[in-house]
Amino acid sequence: MAHPSQLGFQDAASPVMEELLHFHDHALMIVFLISTLVLYIIVAMVSTKLTNKYXLDSQEIEVIWTXLPAVI
């Protein structure tokens, strides 16, 4: 039964819907892991002190291009 403040799908009424729920959960976990990896790489690249300052000219726009779709 669905509730007004529910964040996920309602209970499955058929075996196909149960499989769809499992697929959704699996896909969401993969998307979460990829987003976490990208965030870690961005933070590591921005916060490191071992890089050349002149090589980072276009890195800010690349961070925006990567982070903006994840936020949206």
UniProtKB/Swiss-Prot annotation:
It comes from the Eukaryota. GO terms for molecular function: cytochrome-c oxidase activity. It is found in: Mitochondrion inner membrane. The keyword Transmembrane applies. Keywords: Copper, Electron transport, Membrane, Mitochondrion, Mitochondrion inner membrane, Respiratory chain, Translocase, Transmembrane, Transmembrane helix, Transport. It is a multi-pass membrane protein. Its main location: mitochondrion. SUPFAM superfamilies: Cytochrome c oxidase subunit II-like, transmembrane region. Component of the cytochrome c oxidase (complex IV, CIV), a multisubunit enzyme composed of 14 subunits. The complex is composed of a catalytic core of 3 subunits MT-CO1, MT-CO2 and MT-CO3, encoded in the mitochondrial DNA, and 11 supernumerary subunits COX4I, COX5A, COX5B, COX6A, COX6B, COX6C, COX7A, COX7B, COX7C, COX8 and NDUFA4, which are encoded in the nuclear genome. Component of the cytochrome c oxidase, the last enzyme in the mitochondrial electron transport chain which drives oxidative phosphorylation. The respiratory chain contains 3 multisubunit complexes succinate dehydrogenase (complex II, CII), ubiquinol-cytochrome c oxidoreductase (cytochrome b-c1 complex, complex III, CIII) and cytochrome c oxidase (complex IV, CIV), that cooperate to transfer electrons derived from NADH and succinate to molecular oxygen, creating an electrochemical gradient over the inner membrane that drives transmembrane transport and the ATP synthase. Belongs to the cytochrome c oxidase subunit 2 family. This is Cytochrome c oxidase subunit 2. It comes from Gomphosus varius.
